[in-house]
Swiss-Prot record:
Any one of the GO BP annotations: translation
Known partners and oligomeric status: Part of the 50S ribosomal subunit. Forms a cluster with proteins L3 and L19. In the 70S ribosome, L14 and L19 interact and together make contacts with the 16S rRNA in bridges B5 and B8.
GO cellular component: cytosolic large ribosomal subunit
Keyword annotations: Ribonucleoprotein, Ribosomal protein, RNA-binding, rRNA-binding
Biological role stated in the UniProt entry: Binds to 23S rRNA. Forms part of two intersubunit bridges in the 70S ribosome.
Designated name of the protein: Large ribosomal subunit protein uL14
HAMAP family: Ribosomal_uL14
Gene behind the chain: rplN
PROSITE patterns attached to this UniProt entry: RIBOSOMAL_L14 (PS00049)
Length: 122
């Protein structure tokens, strides 16, 4: 569960290392985001010569959360860290590579480009 002020790792090669959620998109009173949801983030830590720089405000898709993800078959999946992938206004990833596994739930939310770039889909 991601809410405002949550720090997330960045799971792509856009140049950002750490971001902070500043808004959960989807209604004025929407409080939490989970896997596949789009959030607005501020970049808190970035590498030199990256595509983004510290202080930029961007959109991101949440790809990993520490909170349990319950599936229809009763199984539960959980990750060690919260992570997101930066996207542009056309909902395409800014980076060209995705690091670490991503869950199948992204497919239902139509983030097919992220699924295809990911090394492992759980």
């Amino acid at each position: 569960m991601i809410q405002m002020q949550t720090n997330l790792d960045v799971a792509d090669n856009s140049g950002a290392r750490r971001v902070m959620c500043i808004k959960v998109i989807g209604g004025s009173k929407r409080r939490y985001a989970t896997v596949g949801d789009v959030i607005v983030v501020s970049i808190k830590e970035a590498i030199p010569r990256g595509k983004v720089k510290k202080g930029d405000v961007m959109k991101a898709v949440v790809v990993r959360v520490r909170k349990d993800i319950r599936r229809a078959d009763g199984s539960v999946i959980r990750f060690d860290r919260n992570a997101a992938v930066l996207i542009n206004n056309q909902s395409e990833p800014i980076g060209t590579r995705i690091f670490g596994p991503v869950p199948r739930e992204l497919r239902a939310k139509n983030h097919m480009k992220i699924i295809s770039l990911a090394p492992e889909v759980l």
